[in-house]
Amino acid sequence: MEIKKLTADEVSDFKRLIEIFKDVFENDVDIPPVDHLRRLLSNPDFMVFVALSGGNVAGGLTIYVLHRYYSVKPEAYIYDVGISPEFQRKGLGKALMAEVCRYCQANGFENAYVEAEHDDVEAVRFYRATAYNHEVHAVHFTY
């Protein structure tokens, strides 16, 4: 297994990860055009990490870098995390989260965080099984 941060030249791996997200999250979103995905991968405030098994994308996550006015250190908002069903419960997700946390620490981030809906029992159980520092219960409002 290998974990890597995608570059703008690795759009095909990003597309494969989006397919995994579609499967895992059971949504039928259209995959955006290649130019859009390449632009995202070129944006220093957006990152994609993938877990590879046998050279193929088995899962991954996306990160939005948040710059804050009260600290010179950014935060990493881990947005989507998905592992292909055939690779779940084999340590890939935990290894991915651990590698991302190491990356963030080595690159001067204040912290990294991820949200899970309270009723998403599997996601909450997964995150509680990782090496997190703090759990916050919050109410999320969408506009």
What is each residue range found by the language model?
Residues 1-16:
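A short beta-loop-alpha structural element at the N-terminal edge
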Residues 67-78, 88, 134-136:
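A conserved beta-turn-beta hairpin within the catalytic core of GNAT-like acetyltransferases
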Residues 87, 91-99:
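Conserved acetyl-CoA pyrophosphate-binding loop and the N-cap/start of the following alpha-helix
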Residues 94, 118-137, 143:
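Conserved active-site alpha-helix within GNAT-family acetyltransferase domains
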Residues 27-48:
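Active-site rim helix/loop that mediates acceptor-substrate recognition in acyltransferases
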Residues 97, 104-116:
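Conserved GNAT acetyl-CoA-binding A-motif
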Residues 50, 56-65, 77, 82:
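Conserved beta-strand in the GNAT
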Residues 16-29, 69:
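Helix-loop element at the rim of GNAT/NAT acetyltransferase active sites that forms part
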